[in-house]
């Protein structure tokens, strides 16, 4: 047991306690009790702990600690994800900083992968060290890396099985393409950013001298224009892809163009003839109602192209530059039928059968970057009189979340998983309740995604990751197997047949979908037995954000069901997303990221600025970010400790909403920890030398552990606090079951701060200092008992301070155990408080009395040390009994000189008044304050505040201000008005009192 210090300093014990817990093996599954399993969403191995991690991991840790204390066999499975793209970027950047001239390409595939493994050994466990600092009580001996041998074997097995079942195929389709990374990326890695752009109107001449009568109308239906035209005006935001157009499109019911459907136009700059088609996808009111169709460079156009069997012409290469020549491909999606399992398939059906004539691009455009090409194409169009107009236009621009580059829809050969049958089963499992969403409204999001699912692109053009287990021969046939040896044996391929493994790797979500069962040894029977596959699958709950319900949650449900016949988890608890205090998403580019460790351990202003401005994708933002940081944190961030951060997170964890993280809340909960520390010091000082530690003062619990003897209260205050303890214990269990961490934190905070620290500690003082030795002894025991129980209730949320304090309190109750984290969680049935109802009601009445009189003191600015008189009038018999019963407590708590009763007919002197039920409380003013001076002061202050309210109302009634000022400024003014109004009401109340 450590030396108990006089002040709360989390740095003095948090790291020490964690090391003791881990060394003792307290985080490992016990192997007895009901299994309770949580899967940690594996963070990127490249990453550091961010607020989203801290938020979810705090809630997971609270659940694990709670169930561990409830006697469950808890397994918290942790690990890290290999993070293909992110890791390649980090290692490449590090090589550049080393200045040796090494690059990914100069090292080659094998050399670069070796470099990644070196980096992983040196830096890959950073995030796990940070998780320990937060207090994560996971079994680190089972920590898994997605590139470890066991998960890698699971990935290969899953790929081969799905391929053999016809669920995996290789085909030519449109994907998200990052032209800097030169790889396909997932939708989750694309951020759609609203930006200001242009909408260009381009003239596409009708072929063969065709003309039409163009008519326009205003909103009222009046004809505003009638003219004969020989071309269609096409509106586009991407003129650089014009070279790949294979049609122009109108709405079938747009009367302006119905006569032209089936005709052709001449594609500008190329002379190619393309058809005018109709499709309901067109919005007639957008631009001119005529749009170009470029199936190889737009996702919507791609779908149109498939519906109309349009050819697809790819005009950009993998770096988003104009190609010199290209092939016209048929508008039939490749991979539409599954490959057979015993016969090798064509490696790329689209290359074999979907390609036709070769097109030569204009020589002066070939090799140009897409934006340089845009400028040149617009200039060429203008020179030919084909550029009609350019108007400002707001559009959603897809940007890669890592490079910031505009993502290209890119037609390329990739591997895909057929999702239709898998999704139908995944939806069925949720609909029938095999998997429960909390809150339940997220089922609607899940259902929408599953009912509109597309085939999943699983290949990535990277080196780091699980290499696709497919081999090509020199004829382009593909063979899939667990190894090259298996492929050769299965297909009788001799050594004379050259096989080359596919260069691509699987995207990280492919391995992540297997996480629930690959971490339990699948598919190796021996590993499954060793790691508890049957015992720990399904897991109990998945805690995750709504942004990956489809990308991860749905895929785990589908894959786990398909490969194991089980669900991956029973509950999915969906959390909100952590945002900054203004509600903005935290991001490096915004410069508003908060590092949880900086909140825990503190950081200087200079270090904080350096952290926020180093390694920016857009260095030009550094000055702006530094300025904002210095304004928000002029003194840096003070250390708060892990517990203050954890309690803040729990208190903010409302269901399914975005979470605004305000550092001021963390400061408030640091004060809460300090309050708990000081209350414990008070209890320990007032129970020193007490006999509660003797064997007669404790008893064996049902689990065999020694538990403190239940108090036999002798005072009303003891009976009240014990009844409140039973109630808050029941509520804690209910809120854990409902995943309402916010309500749990609120209930425990209210009990600890208000009821135990503020009320019971104060109510205990008369008994502790009184002449009744039995009441004093009973009160000391109850203080210890309630505090020890409270520490157990709080432990899942704030484990460090509760452990440190409990180690001081437990011996006073005769408890021999050495750690709080393995103690039983309090149960409400352990306290029978029915007999305490009357005493509890009396104390609640006392609290109302004391609060009312304290408000009078505050209103009149009476110093705390100044004694006051109390006159009572009216009331019931029960009020008289309670006044007599609590006379000592009232004198002690309120600094009363005397208490007198007035008859109903006696005129009361000038007094401040409060009402409790039918009882009138009067505090005589004579000699207490200078009434005339206080009236004058209040009148002056009331006028000042009324003036401020008038100013604020003037601003908010000004429509120009409300409509044009930034939203934050308007809201700030409304907040000021609310504050001034509250202040005015208080001033008027005090004035009325006088």
From Swiss-Prot:
EC number annotated for this UniProt entry: 6.1.1.9
Function, as annotated: Catalyzes the attachment of valine to tRNA(Val). As ValRS can inadvertently accommodate and process structurally similar amino acids such as threonine, to avoid such errors, it has a 'posttransfer' editing activity that hydrolyzes mischarged Thr-tRNA(Val) in a tRNA-dependent manner.
PANTHER family from the UniProt entry: VALINE--TRNA LIGASE, CHLOROPLASTIC_MITOCHONDRIAL 2, VALYL-TRNA SYNTHETASES
Region (Disordered): 332-356, 691-713
GO molecular function per UniProt: aminoacyl-tRNA deacylase activity; ATP binding; valine-tRNA ligase activity
Protein's UniProt name: Valine--tRNA ligase
Gene Ontology CC entries for this record: cytosol
């Amino acid at each position: 047991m450590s030396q108990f210090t006089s002040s709360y300093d989390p740095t003095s014990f948090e790291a020490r306690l964690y090391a003791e817990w881990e060394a003792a093996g307290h985080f490992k599954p016990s192997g007895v009790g009901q299994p309770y399993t949580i899967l940690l969403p594996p963070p990127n191995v490249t990453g550091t702990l961010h607020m989203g991690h801290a938020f979810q991991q705090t809630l997971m840790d609270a659940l694990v600690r709670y169930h561990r204390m409830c006697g469950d066999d808890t397994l918290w499975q942790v690990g890290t994800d290999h993070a293909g793209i992110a890791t390649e970027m980090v290692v490449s950047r590090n090589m550049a900083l080393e200045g040796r001239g090494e690059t990914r390409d100069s090292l080659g595939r094998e050399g670069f992968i070796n470099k990644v493994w070196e980096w992983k050994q040196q830096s890959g466990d950073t995030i796990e060290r940070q998780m320990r600092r937060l207090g994560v009580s996971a079994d680190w001996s089972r920590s898994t890396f997605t590139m470890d041998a066991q998960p890698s074997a699971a990935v290969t097995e899953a790929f081969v099985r799905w391929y053999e079942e016809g669920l995996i195929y290789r085909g030519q389709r449109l994907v998200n393409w990052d032209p800097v990374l030169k790889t396909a990326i997932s939708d989750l890695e694309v951020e759609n950013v609203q930006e200001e752009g242009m909408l260009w109107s381009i003239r596409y001449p009708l072929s063969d001298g065709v003309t039409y009568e163009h008519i326009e109308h205003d909103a009222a239906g009046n004809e505003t224009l009638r003219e004969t035209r020989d071309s269609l005006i096409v509106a586009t935001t991407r003129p650089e892809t014009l070279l790949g157009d294979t049609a122009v499109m109108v709405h079938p019911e747009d009367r302006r163009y119905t006569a032209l459907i089936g005709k052709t136009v001449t594609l500008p700059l190329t002379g190619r003839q393309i058809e005018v088609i109709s499709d309901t996808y067109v919005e007639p009111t957008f631009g001119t109602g005529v749009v170009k169709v470029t199936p190889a460079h737009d996702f919507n156009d791609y779908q149109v192209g498939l519906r109309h069997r349009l050819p697809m012409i790819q005009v950009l290469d993998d770096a988003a530059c104009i190609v010199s020549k290209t092939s016209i491909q048929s508008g039939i999606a490749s991979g539409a039928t599954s490959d057979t399992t015993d016969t090798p398939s064509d490696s790329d059906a689209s290359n074999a059968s979907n390609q036709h004539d070769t097109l030569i691009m204009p020589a002066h455009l070939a090799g140009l970057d897409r934006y340089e090409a845009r400028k040149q194409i617009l200039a060429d169009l203008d020179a030919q009189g084909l550029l009609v107009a350019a108007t400002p236009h707001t559009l959603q621009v897809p940007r890669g979340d890592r490079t910031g580059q505009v993502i290209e829809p890119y037609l390329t050969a990739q591997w895909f998983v057929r999702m239709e049958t898998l999704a139908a089963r995944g939806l069925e499992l949720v609909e029938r309740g095999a998997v429960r969403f909390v809150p339940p409204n997220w089922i609607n999001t899940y259902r929408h995604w599953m009912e509109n699912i597309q085939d999943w692109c699983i290949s990535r053009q990277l080196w780091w990751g699980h290499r696709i287990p497919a081999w090509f021969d020199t004829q382009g046939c593909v063979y899939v197997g667990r190894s090259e040896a298996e492929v050769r044996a299965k297909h009788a391929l001799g050594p004379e047949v050259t096989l080359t493994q596919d260069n691509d790797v699987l995207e990280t979500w492919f391995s992540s979908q297997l996480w629930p069962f690959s971490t339990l040894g699948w598919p190796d029977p021996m590993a499954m037995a060793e790691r508890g596959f049957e015992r720990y699958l399904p897991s109990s709950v998945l805690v995750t954000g709504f942004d990956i319900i489809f990308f991860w949650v749905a895929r785990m449900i589908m894959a786990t069901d398909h490969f194991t016949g089980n669900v991956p988890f029973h509950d999915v608890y969906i959390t909100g997303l952590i945002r900054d205090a203004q509600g903005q998403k935290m991001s490096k580019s915004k410069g508003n990221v908060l590092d949880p460790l900086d909140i825990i351990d503190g950081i200087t202003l200079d270090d904080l600025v350096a952290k926020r401005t180093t390694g920016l994708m857009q260095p030009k933002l550094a000055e702006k970010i530094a300025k904002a940081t210095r304004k928000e944190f002029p003194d840096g961030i003070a250390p708060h400790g892990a517990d203050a951060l954890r309690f803040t997170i729990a208190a903010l964890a409302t269901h399914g909403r975005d979470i605004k993280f305000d550092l001021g809340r963390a400061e408030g909960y640091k004060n809460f920890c300090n309050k708990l520390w000081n209350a414990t010091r008070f209890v320990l000082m007032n129970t020193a030398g007490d006999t509660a530690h003797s064997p007669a003062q404790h008893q064996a619990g049902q689990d065999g552990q020694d538990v403190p003897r239940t108090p036999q209260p002798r005072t009303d205050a003891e009976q009240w606090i014990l009844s409140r303890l039973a109630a808050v214990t029941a509520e804690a269990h209910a809120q854990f079951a409902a995943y309402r961490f916010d309500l749990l934190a609120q209930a425990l905070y209210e009990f600890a701060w208000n009821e135990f620290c503020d009320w019971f500690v104060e109510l205990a003082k008369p008994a502790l200092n009184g002449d009744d030795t039995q009441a004093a002894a009973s009160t000391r025991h109850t203080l210890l008992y309630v505090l020890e129980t409270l520490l157990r209730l709080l432990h899942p949320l704030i484990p460090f301070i509760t452990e440190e304090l409990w180690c001081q309190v437990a011996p006073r109750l005769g408890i021999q155990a050495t750690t709080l984290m393995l103690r039983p969680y309090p149960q409400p049935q352990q306290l029978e408080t029915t007999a305490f109802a009357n005493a509890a009601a009396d104390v609640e009445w006392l609290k109302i009395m004391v609060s009312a009189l304290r408000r009078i003191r505050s209103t009149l600015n009476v110093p705390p040390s100044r004694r006051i008189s109390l006159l009572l009038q009216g009331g019931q018999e029960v009020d008289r009994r309670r006044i007599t019963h609590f006379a000592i407590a009232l004198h002690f708590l309120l600094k009363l000189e005397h208490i007198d009763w007035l008859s109903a007919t006696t005129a009361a002197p000038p007094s401040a008044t409060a009402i409790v039920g039918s009882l009138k409380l009067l505090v005589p003013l004579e000699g207490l304050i200078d009434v005339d001076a206080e009236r004058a002061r209040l009148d002056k202050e009331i006028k000042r505040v009324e003036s401020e309210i008038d100013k604020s109302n003037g601003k908010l009634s000004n429509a120009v201000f409300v409509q044009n000022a930034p939203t934050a400024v308007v809201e700030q003014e409304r907040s000021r008005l609310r504050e001034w109004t509250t202040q005015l009401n208080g001033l008027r109340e005090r004035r009325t009192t006088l």
